[in-house]
Each structure stands twice: as structure tokens, then as C-alpha cells.
Amino acid sequence: MAYFPMFVDMTERECLIVGGGNVAYRKVIVMLDFGAKVTVVAEDICDELRNLTIDDISNEYKSGLYTANKENRITFIKRRFERKDCDGMEMVIAATDDNALNHEIAEYCKAKDIMVNAVDQKADCSFIFPSYIKEKNLVAAFSSGGNSPVLTQYLKGKEQEILTPFLGDLNEYMGQIREKVIAQYDTEAERKRVFKEILCAAIDNGRIPEV
């Protein structure tokens, strides 16, 4: 059965990522891209994760606990995973190179009703990551239900030709004028007509009107 597409506001929501390798790094990037607060539990972290933080992270990380990033949105905990790490989290990502450990994490999270993704272990996932394109608040995402990541990457490549930075800016503009248009026109039909006219004019002219 296909996965239900649901867009969730992750701003300031607590997300745990277990593992410190390149796969974990890619998941960290995604979660930060959508505003989550990320905790990484790992005995060691890859250079890419180190480069996300301040220059002396190598020294700070040795202390065992380090909160990084100017916005204090990443916490690194240097040790092996413990089940209690999942408690209080809204989302958990098991991204270690140990399939048995990933399965254990997934089983614990499911028992606690915590959303969990075990990388490359579809049966252990209560959610999966889509391929996505993001221009500000405009997001397009593709999922194959975990069957064919190469297909979703193909679709993402096609969509990138359409979903441009201009459309991201245009979407921001449409959001800025939304309440004004709603207040000015009484019926849904009128509002839809005005929004469509503004949208089409901006696309045809290749220019976003001033607010």
C-alpha cells in the first residue's frame, strides 16, 4: 500500500538520529532544512558532521556532549545508543551500520508510538523519506514506497526543471497578498480568479510584483 503524503511543520520539533556516518549526515541535513532540533547519538562522527559545527568541534566532541550550530539546533552525544535516548522524541532515525541495532531501535519506537525510520530497512519504518525539492516554502516530494529510490531521483530531476527559485519567490509573494485578497473579495470564485490572474501574469512576465 502506498504511503500517505503528509507535510508536517518540523520547526523546533525534537528529532533523534542514531549513527554518525555519511547516511546520518544526509538525514541531519534534511531535518535541519526543515527546522527540526536534532540530537545525534554516536560513538564517532564523520567529517561532514564535524564541518556542520564550529571549527574546534573535534576537541569539544571529546567531552562527550556538545551543542553546536549558531541556532543551537544540533546536539551531539558521544556514546553508544541507549533506549532512553528515544524518549521524548517526536521522530527517530536509525542510521547506523548495524541492522540489528536499527531493528531494535525501530521496535522500541513503535512500542512507544514514536515515528521511526530505519535506513534501508523498509519493514522497520513507520515513515520513509521522499526525494524532494525545496524552494523556500514551496516543496515537491516523490515517494516510491521504498521500492525504487532511483525512480524518485529521476522524477526529482525532471521536477527541478520546473520548480525554480523564481517559483519559490512567487509563492512567498502569493502568501503575502493572500489575506488582502481574501478580505477584498467576498466569494471563493472571485478570490480564485484573482489569484490565478496574479499568478499567470507573474509567470508570463517573469517578474514578481511589489507588495
Predicted feature descriptions by range:
Residues 1-52:
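Hydrophobic, well-ordered beta-alpha structural blocks that scaffold small-molecule cofactor pockets
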Residues 45-72:
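N-terminal beta-loop-helix "entrance" segment that forms/cooperates
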Residues 62, 69-87:
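Glycine-rich, highly charged phosphate/nucleotide-binding loops
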Residues 91-96, 102-129:
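ADP-ribose/adenylate-binding Rossmann-like module
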Residues 146-211:
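An accessory alpha-helical subdomain
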